[in-house]
Amino acid sequence: MAVGKNKGLSKGGKKGVKKKVVDPFTRKDWYDVKAPSMFTTRQIGKTLVNRTQGTKIASEGLKGRVFEVSLADLQNDTDAERSYRKFRLIAEDVQARNVLTNFHGMDLTTDKLRSMVKKWQTLIEANVDVRTTDGYLLRVFCIGFTNKDQLSQRKTCYAQHTQVRQIRRKMVDNITSSISNSDLRVVVNKLIPDSIAKDIEKACQGIYPLHDVYIRKVKVLKKPRFELSKLLELHGDGKGSDEPGAKVSRPEAYEPPVQESV
């Protein structure tokens, strides 16, 4: 017979008694997720977080969360061209019960990418790292496909290696010129209608006709130091008055009055 303490009897409790089940959602709060002012739909959803308890602050648990939203939902549009483009927004600050987000990247859905790849054509891709005027380092990926000439009797529309290199150079030059002279707000406004890809398609017509040209992905590699005023301005809440301040005239020997108590 083994000698030892019977833990069940020493505690004086009955074996098999169930513990009181506490619903974990009673310790959580809902917060509204706000998109920047570049998008039509400002409130994109809600998120849960544990309430502030001791040293664990609720707002710190929210910062850094990434939300992936379809462009069709952000623009409140049922257009099919917007539904396959996803924008990533990262939570940077919490004001009351509102989570303020900023642009964190863009991507195409997998089904859209797979549907574009077909036989008898050349796939051309390019990527480049570009820094915006406000200090964001972005890695931009572009994709395009050669288009068959309607007058041609050939089944295929393959581009030569020299033409592929020229088209790739055009892609890099157009992306660099469009983003390097703009801040993040202007870049996002260009990504929403995909105007950069349309400019690339027009610029490459003289080399080889293209179709299905898209900015496939945008990654945010580096960000400038966080400033709350710039984030509030991005959300349309930090704009000051346009009126200049009034100049106050004081005599040269002016001294402030001495306060009796501090």
Curated annotation (Swiss-Prot):
**Keywords assigned:** Cytoplasm, Ribonucleoprotein, Ribosomal protein
Q: Which residues form a coiled coil?
A: none
> Is Ribosomal protein tagged as a keyword?
yes
Q: Where is the composition biased (Basic and acidic residues)?
A: 235-253
Please give an example of a GO cellular component term from this record: cytosolic small ribosomal subunit
Locations listed in the record: Cytoplasm
Please give the residue ranges the record annotates as the region Disordered. Answer: 235-262
One of its GO biological process terms is: translation
Q: Does the keyword Cytoplasm apply?
A: yes
Sample GO molecular function, one term: structural constituent of ribosome
Q: HAMAP family of this UniProt entry?
A: Ribosomal_eS1_euk
Q: Which family does it belong to?
A: Belongs to the eukaryotic ribosomal protein eS1 family.
Assembly and partners? Component of the small ribosomal subunit. Mature ribosomes consist of a small (40S) and a large (60S) subunit. The 40S subunit contains about 33 different proteins and 1 molecule of RNA (18S). The 60S subunit contains about 49 different proteins and 3 molecules of RNA (28S, 5.8S and 5S).
Name of the protein described by the UniProt record: Small ribosomal subunit protein eS1
Recorded source organism is: Triatoma infestans
